[in-house]
Design a protein with these regions (language model features):
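N-terminal secretory/membrane-targeting segments
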Residues: 1-109, 131-152, 185-190, 194
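Solvent-exposed soluble domains appended to multi-pass membrane proteins
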Residues: 92-108, 115-322
Length: 323
């Protein structure tokens, strides 16, 4: 029986080498027409079958251990955090409730509405490089900056991968340690894990998410509960919303105005059901690609009136106002 066992083991090893060394290589998958569907796993399995879907996802599961990673190294970082707490900083708003009330006497907990505005950025920052517009392209943002605390955040993702940004924002974990091509919501958020919503629930918060696209995209419908989000209002549950900019993959993108109505409505529903403080995670869609010129009406376009020498006029002929 030993020869049979040895033969079976050799066959299994050769099969694994063929699958992981050849079949699952990106170039090979592309050559034979396998295009991993990072957006909807159920659709991917329907197109290519259980074996291909399982095997290609398997390649995205293993996370390499970082250099110098150990329990002692983590404890050293925590010691530094404890040491930093000895230093005091002045409150941003000296007359606020948190600044004027001792921590052990504080009973109020703020409403937290966490909005991730799809692809939004302050286009007016281009003016420092010599690009001038015929109007203030970030008028609403500039108005908010006059009355609110604000800062700068750098997105960990560019040109796609919305769920990567969400994952980092909600958990504080970096996707840079994950295998290339993996998506945390699909391969790694498969059971309850520490995240901002789950932590806030221990502090007495009620939690929900609002996103104006299909619930199954990026597997949000299964990932959100594991992050501590108890309710999820997706496009399937939205009625009478306004849409703009049709594409081949959608009948239109829900506008930010309609999204604001959905956020307000969900907040009011949660407050009517309970006196507990609210955490609401919202992700918009209006600014999503594609940015075809014919998808924007004339009254949404602004003109570039000057640009740096060497930059073609056609390159920066028209921009759409994010206001």
């Amino acid at each position: 029986w030993l020869p049979r066992v040895a033969g079976s083991a050799a066959t299994a090893a050769a099969l694994c080498l063929l699958i992981f060394g050849v079949y699952l290589q990106p170039a090979v998958c592309q050559a034979i027409g396998i295009v991993p569907d990072a957006w909807m796993q159920d659709r991917y399995y329907r197109y290519y079958g259980v074996v291909t879907g399982f095997m290609t996802n398997l390649a995205n599961l293993e996370i390499d251990k970082p250099d110098n990673y150990s329990e002692e190294a983590v404890d050293a970082i925590l010691d530094n955090v404890d040491e930093s707490r000895k230093f005091s900083t002045s409150p941003l708003y000296p007359t606020s409730y948190a600044a004027t009330t001792a921590k052990d006497e504080q009973v109020k907990k703020p409403t937290i509405i966490y909005v991730m505005n799809e692809s939004y950025w302050d286009v007016s920052e281009l003016e420092q490089y010599g690009i001038k517009f015929d109007t203030d392209v970030s008028a609403n943002l500039h108005a908010l900056q006059q009355t609110s605390a604000y800062g700068r955040a750098y997105s960990p993702s560019f040109g796609g991968g919305t769920c990567d940004v969400e994952f980092e924002a909600l958990t504080g974990y970096s996707v840079s340690f994950l295998p290339s091509g993996s998506k945390p919501y699909q391969q790694h958020v498969t059971k309850p894990m520490f995240a901002l919503p789950s932590y806030l629930k221990t502090e007495g918060y009620q939690t929900a998410a609002v996103h104006c696209f299909w619930a199954r995209y990026w597997s949000r419908d299964t990932a959100y509960p594991n992050l501590g989000l108890d309710d999820f209002i997706s496009l399937e549950k939205m009625h009478g919303v306004q849409k703009v900019r049709r594409h081949y993959w959608t009948t239109g993108l829900v506008t930010d105005d309609s999204m604001a109505d959905q956020i307000i409505g969900q907040y009011e529903t949660m407050k009517a059901q309970s006196d507990a403080p609210v955490f609401l995670h919202a992700v918009t869609m209006q600014n999503h690609t594609n940015y075809n010129r014919d998808n924007y009406p004339d009254d949404e376009r602004v003109h570039v009136v000057s640009h740096p020498v060497g930059l073609k006029s056609s390159t920066c002929l028209l921009y759409t106002s994010p206001s």
